[in-house]
Amino acid sequence: MDQMEVPDNDKNRKYPTKDLKIILPKTYADVNSKKGPEYWDYENITLKWNVPDSYEIVRKIGRGKFSEVFEGLNTVTKDKCVIKILKPVKKKKIKREIKILQNLRGGPNIIKLLDIVKDPQSRTPSLIFEHVNNTDFKTLYPTLTIQDIKYYIYQLLKAMNYCHSQGIMHRDIKPHNVMIDHEKKILRLIDWGLAEFYHPEQEYSVRVATRYYKGPELLVDMRYYDYSLDIWSIGCMLAGIIFKKEPFFYGHDNYDQLVKIAKVLGTEDLHRYFEKYGLKFAPAYQEILGNHSKKPWTKFVHHENQHLVSPEVMDLLDRMLVYDHTKRITPLEAMEHPFFNEIKNNSV
């Protein structure tokens, strides 16, 4: 459900970070410097916790390393809600998640934080969210039509563009964190526990995201990443849904994950990426990476997915799944891509 950055261990670094080439993102690079510390300085906020008397737990719906998630009931309004009970974790991390959710409140397709409560006896903190009647992605994705896929990916991009426009990277986009009420055609992006404010030229932990959706920058210990990490994860999701191969890049560990990516995108562009940023391969890669030519997307087409594949979606994947994070399409650019033409035309 959720995970957390593990403290970085210097001896595990794959290359020295000095003399690295840093390129700022195409858009929203200076959002936080314009907004100022009162917007992004979560460590110094004072939270006002309410008591949990108005909420009742109905049933458990999920758990992660750092929380347990329940369907709940607001006993005053009789509305369903979701209760995320946080396990003991650093106060700083809790403050960050809450500050980000508060900053994004009202944004398109962003899960709404309704309340924050703390049990007076146990001091256990909980976050109260709006309820979404979600269908598990393993059940839902195989049933989606191409129109459904366009609609939901567009809604996800809309959430992502808003989040980035507010100076925030999600850093854990994956099917488990995208709630879909298919009957009502509602999508919500959840689990902001790994989200972080973007500041230019700041080093970030590479121990974020979930393996199958990790961008190459995380796998090669490139710490000066930015919003473009999220578009890689969306590209992985889109490829998985379109080709009915979930997860699309199925690595057994972080090293193997990059190998799985290289077997599709080829090793030539990967070497180019390393040269551009002055990166060095970890010794572990020397033996396992090999040489691979770029595979055309048509190699993944078969009789069960061919009705979903088009030149437009393959072109969009080409623009999302790019080693060099600075060359990836942005969410706003992606929303203008011809793949979404009928969605845009219908919403006018």
From Swiss-Prot:
Compartments reported by the entry: Cytoplasm
GO annotation terms (biological process): regulation of cell cycle
Domain Protein kinase intervals: 55-340
InterPro entries, per database record: CK2_alpha, Kinase-like_dom_sf, Prot_kinase_dom, Protein_kinase_ATP_BS, Ser/Thr_kinase_AS
Keywords for this protein: ATP-binding, Cytoplasm, Kinase, Nucleotide-binding, Serine/threonine-protein kinase, Transferase
Pfam families in the record: Pkinase
UniProt-annotated catalytic positions: 172 (proton acceptor)
Enzyme category, top tier: transferase
UniProt binding sites for ATP: 61-69, 84
Assembly notes: Tetramer of two alpha and two beta chains.
Name used for this protein in its record: Casein kinase II subunit alpha
Species assigned in the record: Theileria annulata
Source species taxonomy: Eukaryota, Sar, Alveolata, Apicomplexa, Aconoidasida
